[in-house]
């Protein structure tokens, strides 16, 4: 019988912070792309990218709450 790995959450805050950093990087790159190519993008493409950026912002907010929860539980 296999034994499950122990629940090691010691690096959760670091992992979550890395995810936040990457998400913010993607958000900023997307904004730069929209600004650089605004004339070439259709309004649908701009709307899709803007919507995706809004979801990224919501994700970052949720991840920040998760970091707070993790820090409080340690």
From Swiss-Prot:
Localization terms from the record: Spore core
HAMAP family given in the database record: Tlp
UniProt name for this protein: Small, acid-soluble spore protein Tlp
Disordered: region residues: 38-74
GN (gene name): tlp
Pfam family membership, one: Tlp
Organism this protein belongs to: Oceanobacillus iheyensis (strain DSM 14371 / CIP 107618 / JCM 11309 / KCTC 3954 / HTE831)
NCBIfam families: SASP_tlp
Record-level GO BP terms: asexual sporulation; sporulation resulting in formation of a cellular spore
Family named by the database record: Belongs to the Tlp family.
Presence of the UniProt keyword DNA repair in the record: no
Highest classification ranks of the organism: Bacteria, Bacillati, Bacillota, Bacilli, Bacillales
Expression induction or repression: Expressed only in the forespore compartment of sporulating cells.
């Amino acid at each position: 019988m296999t034994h499950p790995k122990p629940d090691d959450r010691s690096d959760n805050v670091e992992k979550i912070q890395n995810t936040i950093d990457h998400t913010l990087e993607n958000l900023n790159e997307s904004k730069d792309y929209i600004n650089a190519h605004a004339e070439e993008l259709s309004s649908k493409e701009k709307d899709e990218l803007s919507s995706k950026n809004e979801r990224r912002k919501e994700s970052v907010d949720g991840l920040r709450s998760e970091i707070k929860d993790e820090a409080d539980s340690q």
